[in-house]
Amino acid sequence: MLKVNHIKKSFKQNAVLEDINLEINTGECLYIHGKNGCGKSTLFKIICDIIQTDSGTIEKKSDTYIGAFIENPGFIENESLRFNLEFLASINHHYNEERIRELCHMYSLDYNNASSLKNYSVGMRQKAGIIQAVMENQNLIFFDEPTRGLDEESIVVFENMVNTLVKKGRSIVIASHDRLAHVHYTHTYLLEEGKLQSEDN
C-alpha cells in the first residue's frame, strides 16, 4: 500500500531521521513509539507530504487515500465543529453527513453545537481531530498521540474504532507514548536516534 525508502531529514544540521525504511500493507495496524522529539511527527508529515524529505522516496499505490491527525489538523478556530468538518470533507468532495454525524455521536460531540472550536476543551479538540482523519473513509490513516487529553471512556471508543477499521481492511499507523492495550497491532517499532527499529518477535 505504501513504502518508505531510505528517508533522511535534518533540521539545522540536526539529523532527525536517518535512513528510515517502512512498509505498510493493507489491513495492518502499526505502532511506533519513542521519546519526545525523536521524529515521529516529522516522519508522518513527510509521508503525508506536509514537509519535504532531504533524501529518499515514498511509494504509494494509486488508490491509497491518506487520512491523518498530526498536531493541529488546520481547523478554523472561529467556526463551529460542523463548519470545520464540512469544510475539510468538501475539499476532496467526500462530504458524507451521515458518516460524520455517526462519528460525532460515537465520540459524544454535538455536531450541531454552534460554539466556536476555540472554546473546545483539549479532549473535545482531540476527538474532532480523530474524526476528521477517518470521516472520508480514508484507507491509510496516521494518528500522532491520538489519546492525549482523552478520558478513559473515549480511549476505549478510539481503540474499538481502530480495531473495527482494521477488520474492514483499513491500514492504521499510531505514534504514541501509550501502547493502547486493546489495539491489535500487526507490527511494533521503536524510533530512536533517527533509526526505526522493528520490535516484532
Give the label of every model feature segment.
Residues L2-V4, L17-D19:
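Conserved structural motif at the start of ABC-family nucleotide-binding domains
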Residues C48:
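Helix-to-loop junction immediately C-terminal to a conserved catalytic motif
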Residues E97-N112:
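Conserved ABC ATPase "signature" region
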Residues I141-E145:
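Catalytic Walker B motif of ABC-type/P-loop ATPase nucleotide-binding domains
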